[in-house]
Regions:
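Short, surface-exposed loop or secondary-structure junction motifs
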Residues: 1-118, 122
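Peripheral terminal and inter-domain segments
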Residues: 108, 146-256
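A structural signal for short hydrophobic beta-strand segments in well-ordered beta-sheet cores
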Residues: 22, 100-102, 124-126, 194-195, ...
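Structural motif
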Residues: 105, 127-129, 198
């Protein structure tokens, strides 16, 4: 079984065999085993702590459509298939299922889930067609573990390790987009960003930090990171008014 996996906070903080977590706070790096730091955001999803060995067992279960490596069925095949179905748009080419993101790598279907907290960056993915699972666990915050996982999968599949980045035609925000999108947005986890109109375009700050936002499609912008892109997509009501925005994998309600 997955003997080193649990949903505790204090247990891991007291475990000398648990990873030391490295996080950047107010410009200073800290190193500790504070597994409760900002951990309240995980309560809805269980807050699983695990190891590489246990997560590989987890990957085997998905690759076997619900059957563990020892032959025991953990969940029904139907349940795994329902988790993998694309249901909610996240960004171009990537959708959420139930607890899993789904995307294409070439003509291959890939399913994954990532996570981050102070001192933690993680990504879990698997590709049934290639019969491979990839787990990247890092005890440092804000590491591009998804890009590492994608590069590893590409290498395994014999593809170019570094994916070609999407190039968008130059586009300007319309007057309606500028008016509707401008404002402050706060997620339920405490992250926030602001959009202000400056010189005929939108200026963005994420948690107070200036962030370059490019208009790419109607009601959609993109932030180009070093190894990946984050899309911002307006969420509008039936009258066309923006009441929230999807940024990355989170929905940020717009403050009134």
């Amino acid at each position: 079984g997955m003997d080193r996996s649990n949903i505790s906070f204090i247990r891991n903080s007291q475990d000398e065999n648990a990873a030391i977590l490295y996080s950047l706070e107010n410009g200073t790096w800290r190193a500790d085993r504070d597994y409760q730091n900002d951990a309240f955001v995980l309560h809805g999803g269980g807050g699983m702590k695990s190891t590489l060995g246990d997560m590989l067992k987890y990957a085997v279960m998905y690759l076997n459509e619900g059957v563990a490596g020892n032959g025991n069925r953990i969940v029904e095949r139907y349940a795994v298939q329902e988790m993998e179905k694309p249901r909610q748009f996240m960004k171009p080419g990537i959708y959420y299922g139930y607890g899993l993101e789904t995307k294409q790598v070439g003509d291959r279907a890939v399913y994954e889930h990532g996570g981050s907290l102070p001192g933690v960056s993680s990504n879990f993915s698997f590709c049934p067609q290639e019969e491979v699972g990839i787990v990247v666990l890092c005890n440092t915050m804000d590491v591009s573990v998804a890009a590492i996982a994608d590069a590893a999968l590409n290498a395994y599949c014999g593809l170019e390790v570094e994916e070609e980045r999407q190039i968008h035609a130059e586009r300007s925000w319309s007057a309606e987009e500028l008016e509707e999108l401008a404002g402050s947005y706060v997620s339920g986890e405490g992250d926030a960003f602001t959009l202000t109109v400056e010189n005929g375009t939108l200026s963005m700050k994420v948690n107070g930090n200036p962030t370059a936002l490019q208009a790419v499609y109607p009601w959609q912008g993109m932030v180009r990171k070093t190894y990946s892109d984050i899309y911002l997509t307006a969420i509008r009501d039936e009258e066309g008014h923006v009441f929230a925005a999807r940024y990355g994998s989170r929905i940020f309600p717009k403050e009134v």
